Swiss-Prot record:
The keyword Signal does not apply. Belongs to the helicase family. AddB/RexB type 1 subfamily. Keywords: 4Fe-4S, ATP-binding, DNA damage, DNA repair, DNA-binding, Exonuclease, Helicase, Hydrolase, Iron, Iron-sulfur, Metal-binding, Nuclease, Nucleotide-binding. This is ATP-dependent helicase/deoxyribonuclease subunit B. One of its GO terms (molecular function) is ATP binding. Binds 1 [4Fe-4S] cluster. It comes from Staphylococcus epidermidis (strain ATCC 35984 / DSM 28319 / BCRC 17069 / CCUG 31568 / BM 3577 / RP62A). Its cofactor is Mg(2+); [4Fe-4S] cluster. The keyword Iron-sulfur applies. Transmembrane segments: none annotated.
Length: 1159
């Protein structure tokens, strides 16, 4: 029984002395008594390599490198005694989750959180922590019974104790955790002859749990010799840099005292690791209360960067410089980090520099396509085939990889199901998934070519293939009752999917392509999945569960699966966290992310037991628990010390001034402290360094080209750049091995987001030799020429979704109002409440099922919306009744179409216009409502357009003038051209151009007491007052509102009279008849100019900004035109918004410009 400890600061040769001692014994007696080297899990591989790579040893039969768990396994193999099944991490969490579900009603604090997966994970961590520190359910129960505890803490401890006790009961004699197996290992250690003959060395630890101290004590009792290596100066001061390892030393002394033996201490005071004074000064002066600054020899460097990405780019450049100029191997270099955000940056940046690396961290399998497929499959069953879960399943492409162009087929299928809102067992309806239904995609029926028919047949075939697999899986799972049945059915389903053979084929293809890491991932995913199924059977076996319970427990298991990737090559950069990485004796260490808040890190408790509760439990239950946050905070300096003393030659510290989310970051106070250790150590600003020495950025051809792009862009913008960048460009351009991709970069330098004007032939191919178009198409061109080109030239369409759009609502109102108007022949004024209700119900029952494949009957929300639509229609009809009672104008036509060649007598004729190129313009459309009033040989017409949006229910004459609002003038022109078809007199004149807002008004009152019924009705009707422009002819005004008299303000149309009977210009919207004709003529001119521009091939990205609003705000093509609001303001067109359109039109008329012959 010999107990030793090696004590010394970092770099004093403790580990080297131990290894040399072991090697000498192996050389003297290769088959002698066993030597056991116990190290942390992450260090075992490196230590094994130390023996394998030794030229004199070439491995070892006598020495074994183990961590505590593997040591216990080795002893159990020798003496037996472990009969229970060891639970994996996933199995433990699945068992705890199931216990929580069973006892949900018994939990006082965590009952409401029982369904959350995270709770079982936290409970597993807490129970494992208790086991490491030898805390049992009895300890917790005694604490609760014998002490007065705060209610919340009491309920928490009662819940944890209940779950802990149930877990112990469930495992009793059948299962065992890692911590329990270590407890048993301690008990049977005395039976091991192997241990009795062994010399044990323990290295790489800075602290131990209570359980590990008990193992060390048992080893000291039964092994020939135990030696523990500690990085400490032996100081026991509570605020010492070495507080943590010194605490370990105190525990070792306690063990020696209990065993009544001496703890032999060997002190190491000479530094061997550091090859220069910089590193010696760094080690010696860090965290010292008194230090003497030394002159800097350039072996310790600090640089700051503007961003984290630029920081890692600089590290990559410096690594290449190390390898190229200092003759380092990649394996001589390590990168240490603390902020998890850096892990992604390493994986995205280092490969672009061709730097091999290995990150010593486990990565979740959650986002692997196979795992995504499995979890989607579970969600499909859980959600009763919800559309989102089904599409996720398809998009993994795991079940559809046998189809050519499967991704494209899935995209087409997605378009279809999103349009139809497929859910539940509608996925099985073959009438929905038919060629005929696919031909109606986009709300219009299309004649399919043979090629399209074949394509959609393949889509249907792909859909059926996946649906059959899902049906098989669902049926198999529904027939199961026990966990063993479920697991068996699950595996059989995977075989039915032919997944095992598919994955083997993929793995072989990846290995042939040299993608060994990706191939290894497939192996690990499959093995992990099988392990979860095995764990389920092991833990639950024939226990009955509902399908939902099984899927929940299974999902918990999948959550725990992680990739453990072994290094793919021996010569690679080691990357790890500062807390865990084992990277001793590297030539160059890069410590990145040295920012305040990261090092030192603000430590907070993330366990179920808070720091205050830990202290309470320790004080009253007389146990020791894991360190609290304040203790861990004290050890932050030690974390930094251990990380920076791993190097033999150089250490480079770096930090960024800005985080990934754009937040400002500060330098770590540790770096400020390190800087003070040297007289002339300066922090290098990368921006200044690269400006002065641009060659430092040119370490790799690919990245140099990317940087070159930035500098050449500045050069083209007449910025001053270093001539060496131009030299680099010429060198790369003239080198066939380096210039790949350079043309693409240089082309993008001169790229301007400009479209090309189409030639005459291409314009006619896109638009035809005749322009057949609606008014809105011309308005769209005026808003932005590119918008017109994208929608009508390229014919780009947004994906149609199974949801109600704004234009759907407008279409519904138009259809319902037309139906009712036709039924009553436009006689709104004679409607009564009963008629209004019955007609509305009748119209909705007929029209709503036709909207978006019966969308409005698909959910409770849409059924409520249907009722709301009905209420709005009824309100609108009441307003129309009121307006009809006080107007001489009579509704004559509803939803009246017009075109060059009418299809029937009900449609109107639209006379073609001619572009400047001589191309006919055939305008077509539909007028919502035409009202007429005839007196003698004069007829007057109103154009009324229904709008469901208040913002669009306004006639803006400035917009009319500039061609942004062409609808009303066009409609009036068409009606005036068709007096015969409308049955009007020979003399037809414009009455009003009016918008009617279809809505349900909301009247605001300060309080219930302020409500006056008469005033309420007046305000209600005023909300339906039509807006627009009226002919100021007194005959027209009198007919529009028969109540017109002095001091009267109409609540029907925009007209008001003064006390003297004159038109109130402020409250009225009127114009002379000739002005209206002039507006119509000007509108025609806008049509001709717009159509001529279209046929000239204009496609500019040139949105027209009006009243500080851009059409881009509501445009569907922003992702195509790439217009940028910050940098493309020069593209915006504007108009003079201060003009008075009616005055301008009058001026044109006076100058003899545009004229109109009314008849």
């Amino acid at each position: 029984m010999e107990f030793n400890t090696y004590i010394g600061r970092a770099g004093t040769g403790k580990s080297t002395a131990m290894l040399n001692q072991i090697k000498n014994k192996m050389k003297q007696d290769p088959l002698g008594d066993p030597i056991v080297l116990i190290a942390p899990t992450q260090s075992t591989f490196q230590l094994e390599q130390a023996f394998v790579n030794d030229s004199e040893l070439h491995g070892s039969l006598r020495t074994e490198v183990l961590h505590f768990e593997r040591l216990s396994h080795r002893v159990f193999q020798e003496v037996g005694g472990l009969t229970e099944q060891r639970l994996s991490k996933a199995a433990l969490e699945m068992m705890i989750f199931h216990i929580v579900q069973q006892h949900e009603s018994d939990l006082k604090l965590y009952g409401s959180q029982a369904q959350y997966y995270g709770l079982s994970e936290k409970l597993a961590e807490q129970i494992q922590d208790f086991k490491k520190y030898n805390v049992t359910p009895e300890h917790l129960n005694q604490l609760i019974e014998n002490h007065s505890i705060q209610t919340r803490t009491k309920h928490k401890l009662e819940d944890i104790s209940l779950i802990y006790k149930q877990l112990e009961s469930r495992m009793n004699g059948e299962f065992i955790t890692t911590e329990d197996s270590l407890q048993q290992f301690i008990e049977i250690l005395s039976q091991s002859q192997w241990i009795k003959k062994a010399e044990v060395f323990i290295d790489g630890f800075h602290n131990f749990s209570t359980l590990e101290y008990r193992i060390i004590e048992a080893l000291v009792q039964h092994a020939k010799q135990v030696t523990v290596l500690l990085t400490t100066d032996g100081s026991h001061h509570p605020f010492s840099l070495f507080r943590k390892p010194s605490e370990v030393l105190s525990h070792l002394e306690d063990i020696a005292n209990r065993l009544n033996i001496n703890l032999n201490k060997t002190y190491f005071n000479t530094f061997y690791r550091y090859n220069n004074d910089d590193l010696k000064n760094l080690e010696n002066g860090f965290d010292a209360l008194q230090f003497t600054p030394k002159h800097h020899q350039n072996h310790v460097k600090i640089f700051e960067s503007s961003s984290m990405r630029e920081e890692i780019n600089e590290v990559a450049r410096r690594i290449l410089k190390d390898v190229r100029e200092a003759d380092y191997k990649f394996r001589d270099i390590a990168i240490l980090y603390r902020d998890e955000s850096y892990a992604y940056l390493f994986e995205s940046i280092l490969p672009s520099y061709d730097i091999p690396f290995n990150i010593d961290t486990k990565k979740s399998m959650t986002h692997h396509p196979i795992m995504e497929m499995l979890r989607s499959l579970l969600e499909v069953i859980r959600s009763n085939w919800h559309i989102n879960a089904m599409l996720r399943l398809f998009k993994t492409n795991v079940l559809t990889s046998q189809f050519k162009r499967s991704s494209y087929l899935i995209d087409l299928l997605e378009n279809f199901v999103l349009e139809r809102g497929i859910y539940g067992k509608r996925w099985l309806d073959e009438d929905i998934f038919s060629i005929d239904q696919f031909s109606r995609m986009g709300r219009k029926s299309h004649q399919l070519t043979e090629g399209h028919q074949a394509l959609y047949k393949e889509v249907i075939k792909l859909k059926k293939n996946v649906i059959n697999k899902v049906l098989y899986f669902e049926q198999a799972m529904n027939e199961a009752h026990t966990v063993k049945d479920y697991a068996t059915s699950f595996y059989e389903s995977l075989e039915y999917f032919e997944l095992p053979s598919q994955l083997m084929t993929q793995r072989d293809e990846l290995e042939l392509a040299g993608l060994t890491e990706k191939a290894e991932e497939i192996d690990q995913v499959w093995n992990g999945l099988i392990q979860i199924l095995d764990d389920l059977v092991t833990v639950f076996d024939d226990q009955e569960m509902t399908l939902q319970q099984f899927l929940d427990v299974f999902d918990i298991g999948l959550e725990q699966l992680e990739f453990v990737m072994i290094p793919q090559t021996l010569d690679q950069v080691s990357i790890g966290t500062m807390d865990l990485a084992k990277v001793d004796n590297k030539k160059h260490i890069y410590m990145v992310g040295m920012n305040d808040g990261i090092l030192p890190q603000t430590v907070s408790s993330s366990s179920l037991i808070t720091d205050e509760e830990k202290k309470y439990v320790e004080d009253n239950a007389h146990v020791e628990l894991s360190p609290t946050s304040d203790i861990l905070q004290m050890d932050e300096a030690f974390v930094c010390y251990i990380a920076m003393t791993r190097s033999q030659q150089s250490v480079t510290f770096s930090y960024s001034l800005m985080g990934n989310s754009g937040d400002e970051k500060e330098i770590s106070p540790f770096l400020t402290q390190i800087k003070e250790l040297f007289y002339d150590l300066e922090i290098t600003n990368l921006q200044d360094l690269h400006k002065a020495q641009p060659l430092l950025m040119m370490q790799h051809s690919h990245q140099t080209k990317i940087q070159l792009f930035e500098y050449l862009r500045g050069w083209l913008d007449h910025e001053d750049i270093d001539y060496r960048w131009l030299d680099a460009y010429l060198a790369i351009r003239d080198d066939d091995q380096l210039n790949q991709g350079l043309d693409y970069l240089t082309t993008s330098l001169t790229y301007d987001n400009e479209t090309v004007q189409l030639n005459e032939i291409l314009s006619q191919q896109l638009y035809g030799k005749t322009i057949n178009a609606s008014v809105s198409r011309f308005e769209g061109y005026q808003q932005c020429p590119f918008k017109h080109y994208a929608s009508h030239g390229l014919r780009l369409n947004e994906r149609t979704k199974y949801e109600l759009q704004n234009f759907d609502l407008g279409d519904i109102f138009h259809s319902v109002l037309k139906y009712i108007s036709d039924r009553i022949y436009g006689d709104f004024k004679n409607l009564d409440t009963k008629n209004i209700q019955s007609l509305t119900k009748e119209a909705l029952e007929l029209i709503l099922p036709k909207v978006q494949f019966n969308l409005l009957n698909s959910s409770a929300y849409y059924k409520y919306l249907s009722k709301k639509i009905g209420s709005i229609v009824e309100t609108t009809l009441k307003a129309l009744k009121y307006q009809g009672e006080y107007s001489k104008f009579v509704p004559q036509r509803f939803e009246t179409g017009f075109r060059k060649s009418p299809k029937n007598k009900g449609e109107l004729v639209a006379q073609p216009l001619i572009t400047n190129q001589g191309i006919p313009i055939n305008i077509r459309g539909q007028i919502d409502r035409i009202d007429t009033y005839t007196k003698g040989d004069h007829s007057y017409v109103n154009i009324i357009d229904y709008k469901s949006s208040e913002s669009s229910a306004t006639l803006d004459l400035t917009k009319v003038y500039y061609g942004l609002q062409m609808q009303m003038m066009t409609y009036m022109d068409i009606v005036l051209q068709n007096k015969e078809r409308l049955g009007l007199t020979d003399i037809v004149k414009p009455g009003g151009l009016l918008y009617f807002h279809v809505h349900e008004p909301r009247i605001k009152f300060k309080s219930w007491a302020d409500i006056d019924e008469d005033q309420f009705q007046k305000d209600y009707i005023k909300n339906f007052k039509m807006s627009g422009l009226l002919n100021r002819d007194q005959e027209v005004l009198d007919a529009l509102d028969i109540r017109l008299e002095p001091k009267y303000n109409s609540d029907i149309v925009p007209i008001a009279l003064t006390a003297k009977g004159a038109i109130n210009q402020r409250s009225s919207k009127v114009a002379d008849e000739n002005i209206i004709y002039q507006l119509i003529e000007h509108n025609k001119k806008n049509f001709i100019e717009t159509a001529s521009h279209i046929m000239d091939g204009h496609t500019e990205v040139a949105p027209l900004k009006y009243k500080q609003v851009l059409p881009c705000q509501f445009c569907n093509y922003k992702s195509v035109c790439h217009v940028d609001g910050l940098i493309d303001s020069k593209r915006y067109r504007t108009v003079d918004e201060s003009i008075k359109p009616l005055d301008l039109i009058q001026q044109l008329r006076n100058e003899g410009g545009e004229r109109h012959d009314s008849n």
